Amino acid sequence: MKAIVYTRYGPPEVLQLQEIPKPDPSDHEVLVKVHATTVTIGDCRMRSFTVPPGQWLFARLYLGIFGPRRPILGMELAGEVEAVGKIVTRFKPGHPVFASTFEANFGGYAEYKCFPENGVLAIKPANLSFGEAAASVEGGITALRC
């Protein structure tokens, strides 16, 4: 599958299109074929390693000391369930979904992404396009949790 990856921090030019292995869902995971994703301020800050001075050490430990620990950015996405693990009951192949990748180690800039069944993943509202659904994830989660 194709993915946009980065192996060092820096300007947008550090992003590269690469061929990587397609993930296989484990027994409790859902494999999503990505139809839409976004570019958030979080993605830009992770890519460039532009963080507030007081958070520098924590950010380096979380994101990667010498280079990105998680090479595929993308904090939100929308797509279609392609496969499910053996014990998954909430989702079926063909379900349209939208999700936050924050708790799933990012990865929205890839053609496929695995999520735990109990992750931040929900059925996409029928009245939203995949692009609209992907763009509503972080704002919607913020509204729900505040």
Give each language-model segment a name.
Residues 21-38, 50-103:
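Glycine-rich beta-strand-centered segment in the early N-terminal region that forms part
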Residues 17-19, 112:
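Well-ordered beta-strand positions in beta-sheet-rich domains
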Residues 63-76, 90, 99-146:
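NAD(P)H dinucleotide-binding glycine-rich loop of Rossmann-like/cofactor-binding domains
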Residues 9-10:
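Proline/serine/threonine-rich low-complexity linkers at boundaries of modular beta-sandwich domains
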Residues 1-2:
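Extreme N-terminal starter segment of soluble prokaryotic enzymes
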Residues 42-48:
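Cytochrome P450 core scaffold surrounding the K-helix E-X-X-R motif
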Residues 6, 82-83, 114-116:
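Short beta-strand-to-turn element immediately C-terminal to the catalytic PLP-Schiff-base lysine
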